[in-house]
């Protein structure tokens, strides 16, 4: 086997050569393989929370917070040592840390050695196990990400409220099984998907309010090493943990954990992210269907191209992306469910490789979904002229349930009325499909049926009323608006958020 010289490897695809940059660790691999979710879709704020360099700084800040608390509680840690660590905190060299890890085969030990060498001291990590560092810092990343996603959720709900209000009285043809059903309004349809997301938003608030951090619990959860450091003084150990939790800014702390916090908590987090994405995904799937009928669209930016082959195409590519993000989140939810209920004794690291991928990428996915969805909500449009033509075509069918109720009120049995209306409706549809008629003449057919005690004028009036009758849709939209208004007042920063430009 002849190995190519470093930097000369080429991949041949249909006779086109693509040179790969040299990787210093392995000359056969490209230098950088990007995280597509982070690089292409996530916002800078989420990228910063989960970046490798950002995490190292968070870990160092955590070590410093522990040292300060330990010193305040009587441990012999010189002030100049803490100052030296603080001075070195932002000097991050991932390559140097990786070189140490290749020797130690232990990521935390490598980062301890790196930080100690930079500061010239050995005072970090006293009485701590690796999970005291990694679990708390990862939970801090999760918690800060949840807060960011909460604010973007408010931005989405704000736009849904505005769009629902804008089109509250625009009557459209509602569809069940994707078949014309009854009149509704576009505002009601938007509020329908908005209320689904509102329910998920309340679940998100609950997760944030009750999110428990692991705290300083030691190797198996008993705080044995911290108790040794403080000569068995349990009050000082609890005080230390309280100070560290205050540094993290978490609402509560686990008491009875082992080496790891329960992975069912990760499942809960990814579950609520998937729940949050479900309403937007259904909305976007429906908007794609509406675009196919030319009744609405997600918008089409100047210079945008729908197809490299078909110049006329204006595809719902952003809505499709939202649906794709939802699929990704459901994949990570499956990963999270695999970890929940799978803990051996006090814990191990079998979950580590899964969580390294699942946690950041789940947040990148929901963040990218919201950035895209906000853009859709800002740029979407509806087309009343096309909607009006669709309504006119289907309106006699859409009002058949009202006709049936009026017939019942006039004394006909419900099932008798149902049977008669169904016979004529199906016959009318079949004649329209076969080209035997070009006009929906259902009203005339019903008027000539003795089983229906309503004359043509009464039937025509019922159908005409359907042009503006969407039941209780307006009141239901108003209820949705009130709920969102209350949330906007609680989170004004979130309501004012504007998305960045999307690819």
Predicted segments — roles?
Residues 1-28:
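N-terminal amphipathic/basic-hydrophobic helices that include classical n-h-c signal peptides
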Residues 25-223, 230-245, 306-307, 317-321, ...:
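A helix-coil-helix interface module used to build multimeric assemblies
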Residues 328-412, 420:
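Long, amphipathic alpha-helical stalk/connector segments used for oligomerization, subunit docking
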Residues 262-295, 304-365:
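A conserved active-site cap/scaffold subdomain adjacent to cofactor or substrate pockets
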Residues 60, 105-108, 153, 157-160, ...:
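Alpha-helical transition-metal enzyme core signature, strongest for iron centers
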Residues 47-51, 96-98, 304-324, 346-361, ...:
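Short beta-alpha connecting loops at secondary-structure transitions
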Residues 243-259:
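A short, charged helix-loop
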Residues 379-449, 470, 482-486:
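C-terminal alpha-helical interaction appendages
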């Amino acid at each position: 086997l002849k190995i190519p010289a470093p930097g000369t490897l080429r991949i041949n695809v249909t006779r086109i050569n693509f040179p790969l940059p040299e990787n210093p660790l392995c000359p056969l691999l490209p230098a950088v393989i990007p995280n597509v979710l982070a690089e292409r879709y996530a916002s800078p704020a989420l990228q910063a929370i989960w970046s490798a360099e950002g995490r190292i700084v968070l870990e160092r800040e955590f070590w410093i917070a522990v040292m300060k608390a330990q010193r305040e509680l009587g441990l012999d840690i010189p002030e100049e040592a803490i100052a030296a660590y603080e001075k070195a905190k932002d000097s991050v060299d991932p390559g140097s840390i990786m070189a140490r890890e290749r020797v130690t085969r232990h990521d935390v030990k490598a980062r301890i050695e790196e930080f100690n060498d930079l500061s010239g001291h050995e005072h970090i990590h006293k009485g701590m196990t690796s999970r005291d560092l990694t679990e708390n810092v990862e939970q801090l990343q999760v918690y800060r990400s949840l807060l960011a996603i909460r604010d973007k959720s408010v931005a989405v709900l704000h736009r849904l409220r505005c769009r629902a209000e804008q089109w509250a009285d625009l009557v459209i043809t509602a569809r069940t099984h994707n078949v014309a059903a009854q009149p509704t309004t576009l505002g009601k349809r938007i509020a329908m998907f908005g209320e689904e997301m509102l329910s998920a938003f309340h679940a998100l608030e609950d997760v944030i309010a009750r999110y428990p951090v692991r705290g300083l619990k030691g190797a198996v959860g008993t705080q044995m090493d911290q108790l040794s450091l403080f000569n068995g003084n349990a009050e000082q150990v609890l005080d230390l943990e309280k100070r560290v939790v205050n540094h993290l800014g978490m609402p509560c702390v686990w008491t009875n954990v082992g080496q790891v916090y329960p992975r069912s908590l990760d499942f809960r987090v990814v579950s609520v992210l998937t729940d949050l994405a479900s309403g937007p995904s259904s909305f976007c799937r429906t908007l794609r269907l509406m675009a196919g009928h030319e009744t609405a669209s997600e918008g089409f930016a100047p210079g945008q191209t729908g197809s490299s082959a078909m110049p006329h195409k204006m595809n719902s590519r952003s809505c499709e992306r939202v649906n794709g993000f939802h699929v990704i989140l459901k994949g990570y939810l499956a990963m999270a469910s695999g970890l929940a209920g799978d803990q051996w004794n006090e814990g191990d690291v079998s979950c580590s490789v899964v969580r390294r991928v699942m946690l950041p990428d789940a947040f990148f996915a929901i963040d990218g979904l919201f950035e895209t969805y906000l853009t859709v909500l800002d740029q979407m449009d509806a087309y009343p002229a096309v909607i009006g033509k669709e309504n006119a075509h289907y309106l006699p069918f859409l009002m058949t349930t009202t006709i049936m109720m009026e017939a019942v009120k006039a004394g006909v049995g419900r099932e008798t009325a149902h049977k008669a209306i169904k016979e004529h409706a199906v016959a009318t549809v079949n004649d329209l499909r076969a080209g035997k008629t070009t006009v929906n003449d259902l009203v005339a057919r019903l008027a000539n049926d003795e089983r229906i005690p309503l004359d043509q004028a009464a039937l025509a009036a019922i159908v005409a009323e359907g042009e503006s009758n969407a039941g209780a849709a307006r009141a239901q939209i108003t209820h949705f608006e009130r709920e969102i208004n209350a949330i906007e007042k609680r989170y004004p920063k979130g309501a004012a958020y504007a998305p960045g430009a999307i690819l």
